[in-house]
A protein has these predicted regions:
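Ligand-binding pockets and gating/stacking loops
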Residues: 1-238
Length: 238
């Protein structure tokens, strides 16, 4: 879970209780189940602090903009010389491939927007190629009529017509095999196959269907965009 933005760490995880009043925040430090203190505004975290690790020594010396931190956290590298390194999820798909009809790597709910530096954030496949880019939800799972846009064929195209279109495309493919030598054609074929599997897959529809979860579970995660994205992420992992 990559949280884009939050209150100051001085008010959350790194209280600095011994610092002068003009430096430390207005909140008090509280004891936790772990061997460290947290802010009083994180009582829930304090109760389970023995179940997670807190790293306070992570920093970088690159340009003081969000983008550089995003690059290193998501790819392990700072982009230099115009080379865009792949996100860890893209690299994993490149090495391991897909295990099912589901995308191997999904961004919820949408890609990061501009955050000051106007540089890549490290959310795409970079030099591995577009074939390994993540599947982007681009929807809010907390909305009442939540649907995944790319799981739905256009309304005017039913299942039978969709199947006929695929058969016609296969006929054309078989006729013009000489074009398959180009990388662009291979990428198009790969993307088409992945998209077709996705929109015709019961497994994919089921995984993205939050209505399958009991209401009590959904409410426990929080009926917010962030909460329901966490729940959806859990379903995709499972």
């Amino acid at each position: 879970i990559f949280n884009l933005g939050a209150p100051s760490q001085l008010d959350l995880f790194d209280m600095k209780p011994d610092a002068p009043s003009e430096i430390r925040g207005p909140f008090k430090a509280i004891s936790t189940k772990g061997d460290f203190q947290l802010s009083e505004i994180l009582p829930g975290h304090a109760k389970v602090a023995d179940k997670f690790s807190l790293v306070r020594s992570c920093y970088h010396t690159a340009a003081a903009v969000h983008d550089t931190g995003h690059q290193m956290m998501q790819t392990g590298r700072l982009f230099t010389g115009g080379i865009i390194s792949p996100h860890a999820g893209c690299a994993l798909e490149f090495l391991k491939g897909r295990r099912s009809d589901l995308p191997a790597h999904v961004i919820l709910p949408e890609p990061m927007g501009p955050t000051g530096g106007n540089m890549p954030h490290g959310q795409e496949a970079g030099f591995l190629g577009k074939a390994y880019d993540p599947f982007v939800l681009n929807a809010d799972p907390s909305q009442k009529e939540f649907k995944v846009p790319d799981l739905l064929p256009p309304k005017e195209i039913g299942e039978a017509r969709l199947a006929r279109r695929r058969e016609l495309r296969q006929v054309v493919d078989d006729t013009v095999k000489k074009f398959e030598a180009s990388e662009a054609a291979k990428l198009m074929d790969s993307n088409f196959a992945a998209a077709y599997r996705l929109i015709t897959s019961e497994q994919a529809r089921d995984a993205f269907d939050l209505s399958k979860e009991p209401l009590a579970v959904r409410e426990r995660y929080g009926m917010t965009r962030f909460g329901q994205c966490c729940l959806l992420a859990r379903r995709l992992v499972e």
